[in-house]
């Protein structure tokens, strides 16, 4: 069985035992999150049921890979290089 969930305006298709990285959540490491499901998929049957909830355990808070932003104006001796690392939360789906 799979479920379609939404966390911070992003949608994920998950099943039991999946680990995924989501945008930073304000929960402590080791806590369990309750996430409402948008749809459940069981084989060929799809049920749109917002009453179903997914439980996920928070494994840790990490930073994503660095994204480099480079700006340049030719012939003007202007260059700007900045880096950014997005804060992420790693979760594991415990039950559907």
UniProtKB/Swiss-Prot annotation:
Disulfide bond sites: none
Entry keyword RNA-binding: yes
Any GO CC annotation of this UniProt entry: cytoplasm
UniProt xrefs under SUPFAM superfamilies: L21p-like
Stretches the record annotates as Disordered: 73-96
Keyword RNA-binding: yes
Polar residues bias (residue ranges): 85-96
Function: This protein binds to 23S rRNA in the presence of protein L20.
Basic residues bias: start-end ranges: 73-84
Name listed for the protein in its UniProt record: Large ribosomal subunit protein bL21
UniProt keyword terms in alphabetical order: Ribonucleoprotein, Ribosomal protein, RNA-binding, rRNA-binding
Family the UniProt entry places it in: Belongs to the bacterial ribosomal protein bL21 family.
Organism of provenance: Chlorobium luteolum (strain DSM 273 / BCRC 81028 / 2530) (Pelodictyon luteolum)
Biological processes, Gene Ontology terms: translation
GO molecular function (one): structural constituent of ribosome
Top-level taxonomy: Bacteria, Pseudomonadati, Chlorobiota, Chlorobiia, Chlorobiales
Known partners and oligomeric status: Part of the 50S ribosomal subunit. Contacts protein L20.
């Amino acid at each position: 069985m799979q479920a379609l969930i939404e966390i911070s305006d992003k949608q994920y298709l998950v099943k039991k035992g999946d680990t995924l990285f989501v945008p930073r959540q304000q929960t402590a490491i080791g806590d369990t999150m309750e996430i409402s499901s948008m749809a459940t998929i069981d084989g060929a049957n799809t049920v749109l049921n917002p009453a179903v909830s997914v439980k996920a355990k928070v494994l840790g808070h990490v930073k994503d890979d660095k994204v480099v932003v480079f700006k340049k104006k030719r012939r003007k001796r202007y260059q700007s290089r900045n880096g950014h690392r997005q804060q992420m939360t790693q979760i594991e789906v415990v039950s559907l």
